[in-house]
Amino acid sequence: GATSVMIDGRVSALWHGGWSVGASWREGTTRARAAGLLAAGGQIRSRAWAIDAGKLGVFGASDRMALRLSQPMRVQSGGLMLHLPTSYDYASASATATDVAVPLTPFGREQVVEMVWSGPMLGGDLSINSYWRGQPGHVAAAGDDVGGAIRFVLGF
């Protein structure tokens, strides 16, 4: 098992003219409990953040456009301590185990840019979303991921 502590913070502001801005931050610490192969001393620090900007009334009175820059939750530092066999004595037929640090920090750092427009159209609601992800999954060698979606909702 493990014990995790997460701290979240968010600030936002609405301005005249339908403008809004916001920022969020999440910081976490996880400590693994010693059990089986897990040795005491493993600790992981993680972090995520996002910055948002939006505008209500871009092309009409009730449409909205927003932009988000973010980094999804990522291990910043730390890892697990494993109690593993590291040597073997053939004369006594016994293994010697020592605590080995296993780092869990990825080499990559995923970054995301998202843009969305939504508003009423043809008696329903239309939203158009596009995104770019650099180093998706926090994998340094991963190529960029680009995509989008169009959604139309019509109630009846």
What is each model feature region?
Residues 53, 62-64, 143-156:
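Outer-membrane beta-barrel "beta-signal"
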Residues 1, 6-12, 22-140:
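Outer membrane beta-barrel transmembrane domains
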